[in-house]
């Protein structure tokens, strides 16, 4: 491993579901840049996927994290404090909504799924940031993952668009709250990527085709594109950057209209 932008830094990586996850690509690049990592998993099923990936990059700190359970959050940070004392960066990479409601009309969203989607996809950032602040004694960086559906209507994205809008607003408010402790909070708004979570969105393949045809770079966003931006935001190169929504979408967000692809 060569010396890199994150040499001597420690970070928590959440949101890995498999080897196609954006969080996994970020973890791989962070390790290449010298970071020591803690991987989290949400359930026993995901533990079986996450642990081999952690081993692949020489990470032996793997811990359970269920953001719907306050005790689980407390336990994670207690373990981080015991093993590391302090740490430097956090990736908030989780999002969830009932796949049956990621199609059709937003107006048909159920109360239960609305609350669950906002809790897991947005409020979890607030909870993790609150605990992280206690252990980021020398400042730090928190990065979360968003999508263009936070600001424009994307067919079938529905309640996730509302959750991502709340997430982006939370980034700005958290950046203000935590700035006095030199903790930076930013979001990466990535283009659509073939991941486990992306695949549950109705007509996702059409979304990919339209994105590639419309974006100035004429391609879809890759996990590695997002990973590079995340490592930059974790590093001292971004020491003056906070409260930002950083687009990594091959330029899609600057376009005024979509190209229709059959």
UniProtKB/Swiss-Prot annotation:
It holds the Pfam family adh_short_C2. Keywords: Fatty acid biosynthesis, Fatty acid metabolism, Lipid biosynthesis, Lipid metabolism, NAD, Oxidoreductase. GO terms for molecular function: enoyl-[acyl-carrier-protein] reductase (NADH) activity; identical protein binding. Pathway: Lipid metabolism; fatty acid biosynthesis. Disulfide bonds: none annotated. Catalyzes the reduction of a carbon-carbon double bond in an enoyl moiety that is covalently linked to an acyl carrier protein (ACP). Involved in the elongation cycle of fatty acid which are used in the lipid metabolism. This is Enoyl-[acyl-carrier-protein] reductase [NADH] FabI. It comes from Rickettsia bellii (strain RML369-C). The lineage of its organism: Bacteria, Pseudomonadati, Pseudomonadota, Alphaproteobacteria, Rickettsiales.
């Amino acid at each position: 491993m060569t010396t890199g932008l994150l040499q001597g830094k420690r970070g928590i990586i959440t949101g890995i579901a498999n080897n196609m996850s954006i969080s996994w690509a970020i973890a791989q690049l962070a390790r290449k840049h010298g970071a020591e990592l803690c991987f989290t998993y949400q359930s026993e099923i995901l533990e079986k996927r996450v642990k081999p990936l952690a081993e692949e990059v020489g990470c032996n700190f793997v811990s359970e994290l269920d953001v719907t359970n306050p005790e689980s959050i407390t336990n994670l940070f207690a373990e981080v404090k015991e093993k590391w004392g302090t740490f430097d960066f956090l990736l908030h990479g989780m999002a969830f909504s009932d796949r049956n409601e990621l199609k059709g009309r937003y107006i048909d969203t159920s109360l239960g799924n609305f609350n669950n989607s906002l809790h897991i996809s947005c409020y979890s950032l607030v909870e993790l940031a609150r605990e992280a602040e206690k252990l980021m004694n020398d400042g730090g960086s928190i990065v979360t993952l968003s999508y263009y559906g936070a600001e424009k209507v994307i067919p079938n994205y529905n309640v996730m668009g509302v959750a991502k809008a709340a997430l982006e607003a939370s980034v700005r408010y958290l950046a203000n709250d935590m700035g006095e402790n030199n903790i930076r909070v930013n979001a990466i708004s990535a283009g659509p990527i073939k991941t486990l979570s992306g695949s549950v969105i109705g007509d996702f393949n059409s979304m990919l085709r339209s994105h590639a045809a419309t974006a100035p770079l004429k391609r879809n966003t890759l996990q590695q594109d997002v990973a590079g931006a995340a490592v930059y935001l974790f590093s001292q190169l971004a020491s003056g950057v906070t409260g930002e929504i950083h687009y990594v979408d091959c330029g899609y967000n600057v376009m005024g209209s979509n190209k229709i692809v059959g």
